[in-house]
Regions:
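Conserved beta-strand-loop-alpha-helix hinge in the C-terminal portion
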Residues: 239, 243, 247-270
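ABC ATPase NBD Q-loop/coupling interface
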Residues: 83-99, 167
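Helical segment within the ABC ATPase nucleotide-binding domain
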Residues: 205-218
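The feature captures the beta-strand-to-loop junction immediately N-terminal to the Walker
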Residues: 57-59
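Walker B catalytic motif
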Residues: 192-196, 203
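ABC-family P-loop ATPase nucleotide-binding domains
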Residues: 112-189
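Conserved structural motif at the start of ABC-family nucleotide-binding domains
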Residues: 26-28, 41
């Protein structure tokens, strides 16, 4: 089992990670990863700067969700080669809780229900756990409620959400909005959204997109993993990358997403067959 903070003394102070911001927030080089013995990521490279929004698109099975799980440190996803540097720190040496405390947030494609645990308790526990790891004073009930009410106002969300069990009985749109609200409270530096638009009708999609746009800032970067370009109509990315067979094979601006919508992934895959060199992977 990994230590939460292995390595040199700097790595034992997560607050240093959050303060030591460099222009390139996330740098992935030649990343290989496998799941249950099967290689999924096959030499992926990518650079993300603070303030940028990057969309990761690709067909089913290309490795999009695997990338998100590898970055967040989920068990069962084995990195076999390559490096991931986050704010100058080797991200792969950190346990999942240390990555979260350092500002890495993953919004799941299928948010889980936690019956009997209301959102207020869950969010306060999560926030204070991160503050404790960073050596910061935990928030008491009054301080936390003040913070949460401020976030509810900014995000234009009803306070009814606070009294409901986490995702229990929520619609698909409510679950996704709840994750965006969690992100607003936890204030990550790197937010990874794994198919946040999956299963949403147009009204729910617009609400989720509004939340994401509200949280865009020069200090925060987004990786938006998506299969379709419709989310990008409402959250306009700085860069779009096409992931195929475990590699980024093409990069561009939003016009690349429109090209994919018109011609599909087949043309991209045909021009970059498996085993060929990666093209345009680093933005």
């Amino acid at each position: 089992m990994r230590d939460a903070f292995p390595g040199n003394p700097i790595a034992h102070n997560v607050r240093s990670y959050r303060l030591c911001r460099v222009e390139t927030m996330l740098k992935i080089e030649n990343l290989h990863a496998r799941v249950e013995g099967k290689e999924i990521l096959k030499g992926l490279s990518l650079e993300v700067n603070a303030g940028e929004v990057h969309a990761i698109m690709g067909p089913n099975g290309a490795g999009k969700s695997t990338l998100g799980h590898v970055l967040s440190g989920r068990d069962g996803y084995e990195v076999t080669a390559g490096t991931v540097t986050y704010n100058g720190i080797d991200l792969l040496t950190l346990a999942p809780e240390a990555r979260a405390a350092a500002g890495v947030f993953l919004a799941f494609q299928y948010p889980v229900e936690i019956p009997g645990v209301n959102n207020t308790y869950f969010l306060r526990a999560a926030l204070n756990a991160q503050r404790k790891v960073r050596g910061e004073k935990e928030l008491d009930s009054m301080q936390f409620l003040k913070l949460v009410r401020e976030k509810l106002k900014v995000m234009q969300i009803s306070d009814e959400l606070l009294h409901r069990a986490v995702n229990e009985g929520f619609s698909g749109g409510e679950k996704k909005r709840n994750e965006i609200f969690q992100m607003a409270v936890l204030e990550p530096q790197l937010a990874i959204l794994d198919e946040t638009d999956s299963g949403l009708d147009i009204d729910a999609l617009k609400q989720v997109a509004q939340g994401v746009n509200t949280l865009r800032s020069p200090q925060r970067a987004f990786l938006m993993i998506t299969h379709y370009q419709r989310l990008l109509d409402y959250v306009v990315p700085d860069f779009v990358h096409v992931l195929a067979d475990g590699r980024i094979v093409e990069s561009g601006d939003k016009s690349l997403a429109l090209k994919l919508e018109e011609h599909g992934y087949a043309g991209i895959a045909a021009s970059h067959p498996a085993g060929s060199h990666q093209a345009g992977a680093v933005a």
